[in-house]
Amino acid sequence: MIKKLLIILFIFRTSFVLQAQNAVPAYLDPAKPLEERVENALLLMTVEEKVALCHAQSKFSSAGVPRLGIPEVWMSDGPHGVRAEIEWDSWGYANFTNDSCLAFPALTCLASTFNPELAARYGQAIGEEARYRNKEVILGPGVNIYRSPLNGRNFEYMGEDPYLASKMVVPYIQGVQKSGV
């Protein structure tokens, strides 16, 4: 009798262990809420892996966590389009694609059209090029207003009018996001 009971308990315990081993971690389960998935991924990461996610591994990229299946993130800063691919250890072109990148007009030119639909199309075109070049993040557009003519980044903004900039930047970003960037 005791032997049968021990065998049943062993089978019962083994089935739970096997189920636990086959369970999908919460961070990989799309049915779970985003906050729960993020918390689970952070819980499973080492301190070194967390730092690596926040720290660049090269120009315009951040390391992933291969152990957990989290991929690298590639970015582009091009305020006038998507920057061509550059080498890891220099500013030379990496020649990953056999074409050249597009140069879009400065954002002040876009804002001067007062056309949110054009801003959305502009953003979508940049998003499509970013996708083609395997960029997941675009570091822009710059959402600021001119306060000083001496600001060396003014060319990245949509001008001095905060109302106009706010009306133009939203469709621009929505256009970029349509491409999954």
Where are these regions (language model features)?
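Bacterial Sec-dependent N-terminal signal peptides
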Residues: M1-A23
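N-terminal beta-rich core of secreted/periplasmic extracellular enzymes
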Residues: Q21-V181
